[in-house]
């Protein structure tokens, strides 16, 4: 159902997408490897991912021809019935509006202030399970 825009990406789009994937995955992987709170890693991942997303806006403002990189990772309910788009159930949780920073800052504050103590009480594995359920539940 629908064409993936990834097929039309040039070098700039691939670089931006790669940096975004690294920005959202590296802090979480780091926290798992170093036994630091995963909630903190998620908070950092959300902030770094947003910074990379916002760099797309900056490029567009300087008339750099960049396709909308995030379209294949946004959750659009009408296309979720196709296996091609199942990845959006998870990726949408790390995408935020480039025009309103308050949403991502609110997410970061809640995850940092509530998530870290919750992770300490539940344990890392249970916290990850709760977070993934919330991530998927928020996408349904």
Describe the predicted segments one by one.
Residues 1-11:
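Short, strongly hydrophobic alpha-helical membrane anchors
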Residues 11-14, 128:
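Select subsegments of transmembrane alpha-helices in polytopic membrane proteins
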Residues 13-16, 34-40:
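Short, aromatic-rich membrane-interface segments at the entry and exit
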Residues 15-31:
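N-terminal signal-anchor/start-transfer transmembrane helix
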Residues 30-33, 97-98:
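Membrane-interface helix caps and helix-loop-helix hairpins in membrane proteins
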Residues 38-140:
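N-terminal TM1-TM2 helical hairpin plus the immediately adjacent luminal interfacial "cap"
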